């Protein structure tokens, strides 16, 4: 099984436990990853733009002379539906289709999806709001909070958008879908580790998140409605802000 991700360690360990022989392309090649996989290539999927040709070449080298069940694409493809399509044209894709990723990572399409499924979602725009004080500036398909900052002074452009601030504590849901049903595996509480100019940088997560039963059921129901509209395949996550009994899906 091929694995391509910013960090492939956890996926490789899971694949090995499942009886697969993982071949990993990631940015680290740490000892734990190398112990779990049968082949490794160093490819930096955190750098933007991603070297798509380099990734394809690395995957070709890993699979040379081997039968491959398919490829699992992890973190690093959040804004890369086009690259995901290139990969899927070469190997069976074990996960969400490029079209699914593109739809869910399009901020206006996702906002419309949340409205259609009755899920609270912060107001979103691709043009600067008249009063930017209560808004954030984000990169489409961004991950890890590095790309999020206050909207004051930010300029519109390709691949960026604006989103109204919402109150609450960050919680992430881990999901597993089979293209029909979705199973919520758990909720984790998150926190930020700010740096100068990067106030929302991801700091870590711990599970389980302390959620009231009613909130947990409502969040699970929201995920199920979303999956009914856009069926998910494989592992995925959904980020929320929890404010008492209310929540926003980000």
Task: Mark where each language-model region is.
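Residues at the starts of beta-strands that form the adenosine-phosphate
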Residues: 21-24, 181, 250
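A conserved helix-loop-beta module that forms one wall/lid of the active-site cleft
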Residues: 89-153
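A short beta-strand motif that forms the metal-chelation/ATP-contact edge
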Residues: 136-138, 175, 246-250
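ATP-dependent carboxylate/phosphate-activation module, predominantly the ATP-grasp catalytic core
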Residues: 164-231, 242
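A glycine-rich phosphate-binding loop feature that marks nucleotide/adenosyl-phosphate handling sites
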Residues: 239-246
């Amino acid at each position: 099984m091929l694995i391509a991700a910013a960090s492939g360690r956890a996926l490789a360990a899971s694949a090995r436990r499942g009886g697969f022989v993982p071949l990993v392309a990631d940015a680290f090649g740490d000892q734990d990853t190398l112990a779990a996989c049968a082949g490794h290539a160093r490819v930096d999927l955190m750098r933007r733009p991603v070297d798509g040709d380099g990734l394809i070449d690395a995957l070709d080298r890993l699979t040379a002379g081997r039968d491959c069940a398919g490829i699992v694409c992890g973190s690093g493809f959040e804004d890369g539906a086009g690259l995901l399509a290139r990969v899927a044209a070469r190997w069976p894709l074990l996960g969400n289709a490029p079209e699914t990723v593109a739809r869910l990572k399009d901020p206006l399409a996702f906002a419309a999806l949340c409205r259609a499924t009755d899920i609270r979602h912060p107001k979103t725009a691709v043009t600067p709001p008249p009063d930017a004080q209560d808004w954030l500036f984000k990169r489409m398909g961004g991950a890890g909070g590095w790309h999020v900052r206050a909207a004051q002074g930010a300029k519109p452009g390709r691949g960026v958008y604006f989103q109204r601030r919402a109150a609450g504590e960050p919680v992430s849901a881990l999901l597993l879908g089979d293209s029909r049903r979705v199973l919520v595996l758990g909720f984790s509480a998150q926190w930020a580790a700010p740096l100068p100019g990067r106030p929302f940088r991801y700091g870590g997560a711990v599970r389980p998140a302390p959620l009231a039963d009613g909130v947990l059921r409502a969040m699970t129901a929201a995920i199920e409605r979303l999956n009914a509209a856009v069926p998910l395949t494989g592992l995925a996550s959904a980020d929320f802000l929890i404010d008492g009994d209310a929540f926003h899906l980000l």
